[in-house]
Amino acid sequence: MLGSPCLLWLLAVTFLVPRAQPLAPQDFEEEEADETETAWPPLPAVPCDYDHCRHLQVPCKELQRVGPAACLCPGLSSPAQPPDPPRMGEVRIAAEEGRAVVHWCAPFSPVLHYWLLLWDGSEAAQKGPPLNATVRRAELKGLKPGGIYVVCVVAANEAGASRVPQAGGEGLEGADIPAFGPCSRLAVPPNPRTLVHAAVGVGTALALLSCAALVWHFCLRDRWGCPRRAAARAAGAL
């Protein structure tokens, strides 16, 4: 009699507890299909925020490493070849201070550093100091008012340096300089202060000449008398 309640309890648990059903292969395929449908598509790669004309521009490879998402860099030539020539940009001349600010754009080549070449009418060019690869702007000092110069920017890497136009017998003054090449002609205007001083000097000289002419005229008049009065006296005597 004591075993009857236990037997009834076992029978109730056996029939009331739901039995686990084995998963069929079709169920696994449905789960995999659901996961595939909910997967996000890969984001399209966008160009990196790189401007080859921007001053102090961070290299594009560094932008790819630190960026929040993948980006694309412009194609570059082989580092085993010398860089292509940079492209000269805007040149601002300050005649009063005797200086000029030169701007350029980097070539699509690996570059380690830049430097400037300046011709002032002589065959030998003045070479500036090396500039960092992120630099796109440099300053020229000591320019003479009214002078004509030719400035070129050179890019260099381990394989060599970029090309510049060939200099003629008088430097680059008579060379054919392309419009979008690495060189540009600088025509420094005369210093405005020099023009003012020259105008004041010319005006002073004219004033002195006028005064000298008047003094000379009155001296001759006092010495020889007025020609008109002498003619009038002669006519009256007749």
Curated annotation (Swiss-Prot):
Glycans are attached at residue 132. Residues 82-176 form the Fibronectin type-III domain. It is a single-pass type I membrane protein. InterPro entries: FN3_dom (IPR003961), FN3_sf (IPR036116), Ig-like_fold (IPR013783). Residues 1-22 form the signal peptide. GO terms for cellular component: membrane. It is found in: Membrane. Keywords: Glycoprotein, Membrane, Signal, Transmembrane, Transmembrane helix. Its main location: membrane. This is LRRN4 C-terminal-like protein.
